[in-house]
């Protein structure tokens, strides 16, 4: 409680001191104004007296000081306003320069697009002109066609093997293929003398025979193999 009371007293003292200082300031201002008025009146009387020299009063000096302060404040405010105006002008100039760059970029893009369109149109025109020239060229006459047909007819006659190859190159139906593969034929090897059963294009089949027939086939095959080897080696006269 004692601490609280001391705090309240200190606060009240500080408040009373502040009020006293404010009152003193007001009194000093009033005194200065009175002194200034008295000095001005005395200066006027002295100026009216002959041979008196005019001395500057303290009020005049204070007023001149106040005027100088006001001038400095006005000059500082004018300088701040000029700086703000210069910054605004610089920002406006930068914005105008950026707008000018954007406009130039757009103009350049438009020019490029126009050039591309012109090139495409030129290419299309050239292609059309070339196609028309090709169509306008005269084709082969009837005489030339007859001559070429006669030359083809006068060529060599195709053999059976060539015809069979040409037929083999043609596409076959499933029925034709099945019929061709179902054919079984005996083929004799001229060098060895062996006979084989071949189905279709080249499938080799095994023939079921008796033992005696198998022996005869082996004898013929060995004889044929020997003769073929001797012919290749040049042993036969």
Swiss-Prot record:
Pfam families in the record: SR-25
Chief localisation class: nucleus
Tissue expression remark: Isoforms 3 and 7 were identified in brain, pancreas, prostate, and testis, but little or no message could be detected in other tissues.
Subunit organization: Interacts with ARL6. Interacts with ZCCHC17. Interacts with SRSF2.
Annotated segments matching region Disordered: 1-161
Keyword Membrane: no
Polar residues bias (residue ranges): 34-45
Family recorded in the similarity comment: Belongs to the ARL6IP4 family.
Subcellular location as annotated: Nucleus, Nucleolus; Nucleus speckle
Inducers of expression: In case of Herpes simplex virus (HSVI)-binding to cells.
GO cellular component: a single term: nuclear speck
Species in which this protein is naturally found: Homo sapiens
Biased composition, class Basic residues, residue ranges: 1-29, 101-126
Bias kind Low complexity: ranges: 74-98
Keywords: Isopeptide bond, mRNA processing, mRNA splicing, Nucleus, Phosphoprotein, Ubl conjugation
UniProt-listed InterPro entries: Nucl_RNA-splicing_assoc_SR-25
GO biological process assignments: mRNA processing; RNA splicing
Modified residues (Phosphoserine): 55, 148, 182
GO molecular function terms attached to this record: RNA binding
Signal among keywords: no
Protein name in the entry: ADP-ribosylation factor-like protein 6-interacting protein 4
Record location of the Glycyl lysine isopeptide (Lys-Gly) (interchain with G-Cter in SUMO2) cross-link: 199
Protein task: Involved in modulating alternative pre-mRNA splicing with either 5' distal site activation or preferential use of 3' proximal site. In case of infection by Herpes simplex virus (HSVI), may act as a splicing inhibitor of HSVI pre-mRNA.
């Amino acid at each position: 409680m004692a601490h609280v009371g001391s705090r309240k007293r200190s606060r009240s003292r500080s408040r009373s001191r502040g009020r006293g200082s404010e009152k003193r300031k007001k009194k000093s201002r009033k005194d200065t104004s009175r002194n200034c008025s008295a000095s001005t009146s005395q200066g006027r009387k002295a100026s009216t007296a002959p041979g008196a020299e005019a001395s500057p009063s303290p009020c005049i000096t204070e007023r001149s000081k106040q005027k100088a302060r006001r001038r400095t404040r006005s000059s500082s405010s004018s300088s701040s306003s000029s700086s703000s105006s210069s910054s605004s002008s610089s920002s406006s100039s930068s914005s105008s320069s950026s707008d000018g760059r954007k406009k130039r970029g757009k103009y350049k893009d438009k020019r490029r697009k126009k050039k591309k369109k012109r090139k495409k149109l030129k290419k299309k025109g050239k292609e059309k002109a070339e196609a028309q020239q090709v169509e306008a060229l005269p084709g082969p006459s009837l005489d030339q066609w007859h001559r070429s047909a006669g030359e083809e007819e006068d060529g060599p006659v195709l053999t059976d093997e060539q015809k069979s190859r040409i037929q083999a190159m043609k596409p076959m139906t499933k029925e034709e293929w099945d019929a061709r593969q179902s054919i079984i034929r005996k083929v004799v090897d001229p060098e060895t003398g062996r006979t084989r059963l071949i189905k279709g294009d080249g499938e080799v089949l095994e023939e079921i025979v008796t033992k005696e027939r198998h022996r005869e086939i082996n004898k013929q095959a060995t004889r044929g193999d020997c003769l073929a080897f001797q012919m290749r080696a040049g042993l036969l006269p």
